[in-house]
UniProtKB/Swiss-Prot annotation:
Entries under SUPFAM superfamilies matching the protein: Metallo-dependent phosphatases
Cofactor: Mn(2+)
Species annotation: Bacillus velezensis (strain DSM 23117 / BGSC 10A6 / LMG 26770 / FZB42)
Family per similarity comment: Belongs to the FBPase class 3 family.
EC numbers: 3.1.3.11
Keywords: Carbohydrate metabolism, Hydrolase, Manganese
UniProt-listed GO biological process terms: gluconeogenesis
Coiled coil segments of this chain: none
Gene Ontology molecular function: fructose 1,6-bisphosphate 1-phosphatase activity
Protein's name in the database: Fructose-1,6-bisphosphatase class 3
């Protein structure tokens, strides 16, 4: 088998010189400094804030500009140049508007092209020429390379270089070149992006985030709880589908469902209009400018889908005793005559109920109309071209956890008990814990995705368990109290008890134990965690357990910013070490364009490398070394006999 593979490879490397050249090239790359990794998390559909962080590389762009031009140009010009790199098309329009004469604009073009070339050259200093070529604007690759590789000893060619720039301006191509070089800079300052979960949730534009990621040069995703809900819905889970519609109704984001993904909500609206009225518990968290009739419409949809969700949960709980969720059979605990429910031995009055479609004798039974609505919605979801594209990308680039360059990336938690031991769950008569449990969760999720026609098998039910189950690494609480929040006034019933992981992650020994569970070196590795907003306002530190745990909820969701005191955190990891970046609230692109101010506040060093880290010490390096080994075998097999 191996010789057949080597024969195939020999078609590409058909002489010894080609093999040797590639070996030299790969071995040289192994000794370059490692590229910069950029970690973001909890985007929650907030596209504008996310794409700003992406464009500025969590401050890397301005840092590079300062490295070159500090003391050479004014701070105001540094801000202007940074804004030009972030939003080249918009900034160019504003700048051109300020010039009275063509001559003055042309002088500005010359100066700016020189600066942009210097910036690209500096940002690409640790990359090979071939990697730089891929990052350059395709239509100007040759011209850009000529300008980039101009040396100090180029006196003989000075006029040649000047003429290139003169002609670019004369032929009306300056805007295109500057724009292309701006995007090259963005691409060069970050080698690889990690999205540590929750692209979806309450924000209005998760689809735009997905499009941005699909077009990004190098990315991976660690699924969040909200991402899995969307994957589950596309995979055939009706209860996951009910949840995403309920959340969109609650946060007045039904446009995502209907306008963005083309899912017809008319049958659901008809059902809602028939059975439900206005209800304060189900009014959306809507824009104040929304007309009252629209708010009432959403309120009715919200009730209709919430009641369908509660009904759909019951059969899963009953057919999956190993989920250990019998306590959540809430519709069966209600005294419908008295409008009361008994939880943990205490009876509570229910408020703002909407049980018009509930049969007290068989409360989890869907009306025929409800079942029809869910069938139509699921058909619509599974036949949405755009959603299919987004979910396929999510599966291709995503995983529940990732081991990358010695670090463990995970959105939620590793389920542990009070002593820090891995919690065990029985699945198909076998006990799973720690890494094995997460692996089995991911296997079921992929199985459900591969068989969207199955709607009530174990794999599909497991996608819902990942959203709400006690031992789910994505949920990390004992129970989800959605029902109680809608219908019970007493706040004690709303509390969701967190897994001990969330206080044990402050403890270095517990974090080292988790790193070892995943086969990572606890002396050098870190756990990089999303999911929970860091309450800096109350003095919480995102760097925990003596630097072993780094919590980087990006805080993109505006709803949490009042409790955190900041917008959130991102992380940078380059060849020199790790830096945590705190962000202020992002107001608007217009503000950045007009003032050049940034949303960054402070950077903190998490870890400093004693020696500059090289490519050979990374995941990419491991793959390159495997390629070198294969090429050396090919050389021996074909060319050294």
């Amino acid at each position: 088998m191996e010789t057949k593979y080597l024969d195939l490879l020999a078609q590409k490397y058909d002489c010894e010189e080609k093999v040797v050249t590639e070996i030299i090239n790969l071995k040289a790359i192994l000794n370059l400094p490692k590229g910069t990794e950029h970690f973001v998390s909890d985007l929650h559909g907030e596209y504008q804030a996310f794409q700003h962080v992406l464009r500025n590389g969590s401050g890397r762009v301005k840092e590079k500009i300062r490295d070159i031009f500090s003391g050479v140009i004014y701070d105001r010009e540094i801000d202007e140049l940074a804004a030009l790199v972030y939003y080249p098309e918009d900034k160019l329009k504003l700048i051109k508007h300020d010039f009275d004469t063509k001559e003055a604009l042309n002088e500005w073009y010359k100066e700016t092209i020189h600066r942009m070339i210097k910036l690209v050259s500096y940002c690409s200093s640790k990359y090979t020429r071939s990697k730089l070529r891929k990052a350059l604007p395709a239509q100007f690759a040759y011209i850009s390379e000529e300008l980039l590789y101009k040396t100090e000893q180029a006196a003989n060619k000075e006029q040649y270089y000047s003429e290139i720039i003169e002609q670019i301006i004369a032929l009306g191509q300056a805007d295109k070149l500057i724009t292309g070089l701006a995007y090259s800079t963005q691409r060069l300052v970050v080698d690889h992006l990690h999205v540590v979960g929750d692209i979806y949730d309450r924000g209005p534009q998760p689809d735009k985030i997905m499009e941005e990621l699909i077009n990004y040069h190098s990315v991976d995703i660690q699924w969040g709880n909200h991402d899995v809900l969307w994957i589950g819905a596309y995979s055939g889970s009706k209860v996951c589908l009910a949840n995403i519609i309920r959340i969109c109704a609650r946060y007045d984001n039904l446009d995502i469902i209907e306008d963005v993904y083309g899912i017809n909500l008319r049958p659901l609206l008809n059902l809602a209009e028939k059975y439900y009225d206005d209800n304060p518990s189900f009014r959306p968290k809507a824009d104040e400018n929304r007309p009252e009739d629209e708010i009432k419409q959403i309120t009715k949809i919200h009730q209709a889908i919430a009641m369908i969700q509660f009904k759909l949960e019951s059969p899963i709980i009953k057919r999956r005793p190993n989920f250990n969720m019998e306590e959540r059979l809430l519709l069966e605990k209600i005294d419908y005559d008295r409008n009361e429910i008994t939880l943990n031995g205490k009876t509570y009055q229910l408020e703002n109920t909407c049980f018009a479609t509930v049969n007290p004798k068989q409360p989890d039974e869907l009306l025929e109309e409800e079942a029809e609505v869910m069938d139509k919605l699921l058909f619509s979801v599974q036949n949405s071209e755009k959603l299919g594209r987004h979910m396929n990308f999510m599966m291709k680039k995503g995983s529940l956890y990732l081991k990358y360059n010695g670090n463990l990336l995970i959105h939620g938690c590793i389920p542990v008990d009070e002593n820090g031991s891995m919690e065990t769950m029985m699945i198909e008569d076998k006990a799973y814990a720690g890494r094995e449990l997460l692996d089995v969760f991911e296997r079921f999720l992929r199985e459900a995705f591969a068989h969207p026609e199955e709607t009530d098998d174990l794999a599909t039910d497991m996608t819902w368990y990942l959203w709400t189950g006690e031992y789910s690494s994505l949920f990390g609480k004992r129970a989800m109290t959605t029902f109680e929040r809608y219908f019970i006034k007493e706040k004690e019933t709303h509390k969701e008890k967190k897994n001990p992981y969330y206080y044990l992650r402050e403890d270095e020994a517990a974090c080292r134990n988790i790193l070892m569970e995943f086969g990572l070196n606890p002396d050098h590795g870190h756990i990089i965690n999303g999911h929970t907003p860091v309450k800096e306002i109350e003095g919480e530190d995102p760097i925990k357990a003596n630097g072993k745990m780094i919590v980087i909820d990006g805080g993109f969701s505006k709803a949490y910013q009042s409790t955190t005191g900041i917008a959130g955190y991102t992380l940078l990891y380059n060849s020199y070490g790790m830096q945590l970046v705190a962000h202020k609230h992002f107001n608007s692109k217009a503000e950045v364009l007009s003032t050049g101010t940034d949303v960054l506040t402070v950077k903190r060093l998490v870890d400093k490398e004693l020696e500059r880290k090289k490519v050979k010490e990374t995941n990419v390096g491991e793959e390159l070394m495997k390629e070198v080994a294969i090429l050396e075998k090919l050389r021996e097999y074909r060319y050294m006999k």
